[in-house]
């Protein structure tokens, strides 16, 4: 058995004395692991940095075997973010979430393309807003899509009136319908329904929103915790923008 595919490195760890066990997100074969011979060498360690884009060739005698991976670096994504720890933390968070959330060998081509788009966006000024949208897309790919199209209580579709999200169903709730229960609802950042361009306060709201569903509706069902890389990223983002004088909403 053998295939070649475009791929993103999600994680890599030592295996034996010289090899590495790598996990990739591939366009056509989903999340896929394999053994990289010489993966601990000075030549291969930079290739196996999470977030890097690679050309991958996987081979095994039988399809159910772990198999081996031969990788060629196409883009050193992580290296381009070394001077910006916050954006690098976002990259690490995205890789860790995909690695933990997706079943093995189940194709998710739309998520693959969205992840490449996110990594491109990390070079722009709106990267944090796009990151929040990417997490919403990840939830949808995993079967936990959020619905901001109309109010769950009244059916209203006016984006100017949608202000909350039900923590149980993931559906939007209008300002008037949700106001009596606002302490039990999650804030819906205006940028997610086209009412603003975003900003640090709304990004923090968005991360709280997606974090709730990642924790309660995705990882909890698997008796697992949200990856530590995601927690570190959110903590760093909140700290960075609180320190700079922008106090995020609760």
Curated annotation (Swiss-Prot):
One of its GO terms (cellular component) is bacterial nucleoid. The keyword DNA repair applies. One of its GO terms (biological process) is DNA recombination. Transmembrane segments: none annotated. Involved in DNA repair and RecF pathway recombination. HAMAP family: RecO. This is DNA repair protein RecO.
